[in-house]
Amino acid sequence: HLKRPCKFSCPVDAITYDEHGISVIDKNKCIRCGKCIHSCPFGAIASKTFIVPVINALREGKHIYAMAAPATEGQFGADITMESWRKAMKELGFVDFYDVGLGGDMTAAYEAEEWAEAYKEGQKKVTSCCPAFVNMVRLHYPQLADNISTTVSPMCAISRMIKAQDPEAITVFIGPCLAKKSEVVDQQIEGNADYVLTYSEIRAIMKAKDVELEACPNDNQTASTFGKRFANSGGVTAAVLESLKESDNCIDAKVCRANGSQECKKA
């Protein structure tokens, strides 16, 4: 068989062919990173969508909250701010809107404490915010699974905060990362987001309701620069190191940064 784009793109060799030449994904190897979906020129692979349950919750008037990844800011133009998104989401029927960058600040603070404790005990730690990376460690490097940080992701941190304030809350994460769907479906972390929507999915709902993103002043800033840069390569590390500086935990932490799955494998 010719090597197809999906198989070529897979960082963990999770795609094979059956006797009919049809591509098969090995669920015991797949890390849910979504690279095969983006690489397939035929659109033959798709991620699970939560559009229907989100629409139903909105139509039923449930306490549903939107939480957007920091990458959302500026994703649709320099004039489209988090305040633009807040107004649009409320127009759709969401109770409120939160910047998950604030969850990045929360995560950095807790993870800094965890790093400091591990440093004192001579242990190594790997971050837990990227579900594709966590899946890679658990499935392909199980001997390192105990080194994964127990601190929840920024998405989960904000979701827990919302649910602590409103026990009836349903939380929806909006962002560019398909792997976040795996965090919700596979990891089953208490208090985490109930649903995940990609930008194309939330835009589909907005189009159906004739809701547009409008330019607004950038005055809805609840997160620090470090919290907003979590998705950058080394962003989590930078935020945690900054939290360590601001605390009494002064340690000489040696860090290893990796950009993408291939670098993670080498690290």
For each predicted feature, which ranges?
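Iron-sulfur-associated redox domains of electron-transfer enzymes in respiratory
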Residues: 48-267
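Iron-sulfur cluster-binding cysteine motifs and their immediate structural context
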Residues: 1-31, 35-51
